[in-house]
């Protein structure tokens, strides 16, 4: 196919105005990208806590997201590999599961050390491929304040921002401005000297939803209502509150981890909504947080266009994890396999491929690093050398043919090893450095291994003191709380409960989970938990 630089540039300019886009299906013919004389720049845009939405609220004006959908390829079934921010981002920026990055909990908690800088990051890989790798915005994989160069990224200026109360509202405009300034100066200078760049732009919103609370029972981490700003005034009556907003957290068939997470989360972020109207207000604020972020994303896209970079730049957009938004009576993010929690947006704009396409195959965050390397290299041998040890698929296969099966056969693996969200009544004790440390019941089944396929989701919840790889139904149920949901359903009917329900299907998916763990992790025995400062057992109660 011919290059479409001029058509893309003119169309992007038109797309500066809000429009409604109808996405195409997944029946596109495969295309072969032309040989490029020079490497494309890559801009990686991330948001925080943004769940996948097949369509946007009719009241919204998500111009940047609509713009990328029309110009790029939308991956409709893309999943996070872990939660929450630190854990997921460590996967996104290394192509390795948290069992290898050992980023099991958030770095702003006293027991989680920084990621080992000897682990090769996307920044290291891009540099090895000849790129100038730079970083703007939220990092949250270490406590660094002034430099990320030991992690392979230059020109980071935002400091240790991780998403406090209203931080998206206050900081996203600065992140966008600094990214635009960087493109105008260093980015253009690099290109003029013949060097492509990789720029990561990491926005915070819609993470501000984490602290939204109208109750008097506020959280220990902070709570707030919406800022008094025009962008936060809009209502979204066209979007119904989920039918499961009042589903019991203790309902038969629900793992105990759901109750323990949600009640514990209320203690640190404030009491959850209790009525349908309260959930509506919560969701209105969430959609407005996305709008606020979208405005800054659109500002960045405008600047990319103004600099003439659309013709030689790939843009990748995703989020680290989702937000429950009232589904199943839950808010936030954590250890569960519900759609709103782990299903996230992914769009890739590439100058060599037509826009408005969609891919319906299963993909995951584990695939991002491999994809970036393939985008940045000229041949398979160079790519394989740079990404040695990375186990994800390259999404360039799906860019060439949107019908490519990707993970449809083996599924996408979700790994959750947080201790901070596994107890509804944690103990808080002072730490010698002046911070506070959480102590939880380590016998709770709050750790999780899950698999997502085209047809079903399956999960095992277990205690961090009892890692196990069950090979039969008896040991499965003895050591784990078990979930099985058909894809495309409300996920209110746990097909694996009670024990003896759908035994053949449960056994099949337990085996599938064991297989993908063996392939992508190897021995899954909990050895990574020794990375908690002073070891995991110190934080029991």
Where do the language-model regions lie?
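Bacterial N-terminal signal peptides that target proteins for export
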Residues: 2-12
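Substrate-binding rim/cap in mid-to-C-terminal beta-strand-loop elements of soluble/periplasmic
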Residues: 93, 100, 157-159, 298-302, ...
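Active-site-proximal N-terminal segment of extracellular/periplasmic enzymes that hydrolyze or transfer
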Residues: 32-76, 82, 496-501
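C-terminal motif of bacterial Sec signal peptides marking the signal peptidase cleavage site
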Residues: 23-25
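Catalytic-site neighborhoods of secreted/periplasmic enzymes
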Residues: 91-199, 204-225
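Short, solvent-exposed turn/loop segments enriched in Gly/Ser/Thr/Pro and often Arg
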Residues: 54-61, 72-96, 135-145, 202-207, ...
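Active-site-proximal cap/lid insertion segments
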Residues: 37, 52-53, 58, 189-191, ...
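C-terminal, low-complexity/hydrophilic appendages and adjacent surface loops
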Residues: 141, 217, 339-340, 416-499
């Amino acid at each position: 196919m011919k290059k479409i630089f001029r058509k893309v540039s003119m169309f992007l300019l038109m797309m500066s105005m809000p429009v409604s886009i109808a996405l195409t299906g997944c029946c596109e013919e495969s295309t072969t990208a032309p040989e490029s004389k020079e490497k494309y720049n890559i801009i990686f845009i991330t948001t925080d806590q943004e769940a996948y939405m097949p369509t946007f609220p009719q009241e919204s004006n998500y111009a940047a997201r609509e713009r990328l959908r029309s110009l790029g390829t939308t991956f409709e079934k893309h999943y996070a590999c872990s939660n929450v921010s630190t854990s997921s981002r460590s996967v996104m920026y290394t192509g390795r599961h948290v069992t290898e990055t050992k980023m099991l909990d958030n770095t702003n908690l006293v027991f989680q050390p920084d990621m080992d800088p000897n682990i090769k990051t996307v920044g290291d890989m891009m540099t090895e491929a000849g790129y100038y790798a730079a970083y703007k915005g939220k990092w949250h994989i270490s406590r660094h304040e002034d430099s990320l160069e030991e992690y392979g990224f230059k020109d980071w200026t935002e400091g240790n921002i991780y998403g406090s109360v209203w931080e998206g509202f206050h900081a996203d405009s600065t992140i966008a401005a600094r990214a635009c300034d960087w493109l105008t100066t260093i980015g253009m200078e690099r290109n003029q000297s013949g060097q492509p760049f990789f720029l990561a732009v990491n926005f915070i919103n819609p993470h501000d939803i984490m602290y939204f609370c109208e109750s008097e029972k506020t959280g220990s981490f902070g709570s707030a209502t919406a800022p008094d700003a025009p962008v936060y005034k809009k209502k979204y009556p066209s979007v119904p509150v989920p039918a499961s907003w009042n589903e019991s957290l203790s309902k038969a068939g629900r793992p105990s981890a759901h109750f323990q997470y949600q009640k514990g989360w209320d203690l640190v972020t404030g009491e959850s909504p209790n009525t349908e109207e309260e959930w509506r207000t919560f969701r209105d604020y969430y959609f407005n947080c996305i709008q606020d972020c979208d405005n800054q994303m659109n500002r960045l896209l405008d600047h990319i266009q103004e600099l003439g970079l659309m013709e030689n730049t790939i843009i990748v957009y995703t989020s680290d994890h989702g937000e429950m938004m009232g589904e199943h009576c839950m808010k936030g993010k954590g250890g569960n396999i519900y759609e709103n929690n782990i299903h996230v947006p992914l769009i890739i704009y590439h100058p060599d491929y037509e826009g408005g396409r969609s891919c319906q195959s299963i993909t995951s965050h584990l695939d991002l690093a491999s994809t970036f390397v393939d985008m940045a290299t000229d041949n398979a041998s160079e790519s394989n050398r740079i990404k040695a040890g990375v186990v994800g698929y390259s999404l360039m296969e799906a860019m060439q043919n949107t019908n490519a099966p990707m993970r449809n056969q083996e599924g996408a693996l979700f790994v959750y090893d947080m201790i901070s969200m596994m107890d509804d009544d944690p103990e808080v004790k002072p730490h010698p450095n002046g911070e506070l440390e959480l102590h939880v019941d380590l016998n709770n089944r709050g750790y999780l291994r899950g698999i997502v396929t085209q047809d079903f989701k399956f999960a095992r919840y277990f205690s961090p003191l009892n890692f196990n790889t069950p090979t039969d139904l008896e040991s499965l149920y003895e050591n784990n709380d078990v979930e099985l949901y058909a894809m495309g359903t409300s996920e209110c009917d746990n097909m694996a409960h009670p024990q003896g329900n759908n035994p053949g299907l449960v056994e099949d998916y337990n085996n599938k989970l064991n297989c993908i763990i063996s392939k992508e992790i190897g021995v899954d025995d909990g050895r990574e938990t020794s990375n908690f400062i002073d070891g995991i057992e110190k934080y029991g109660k």
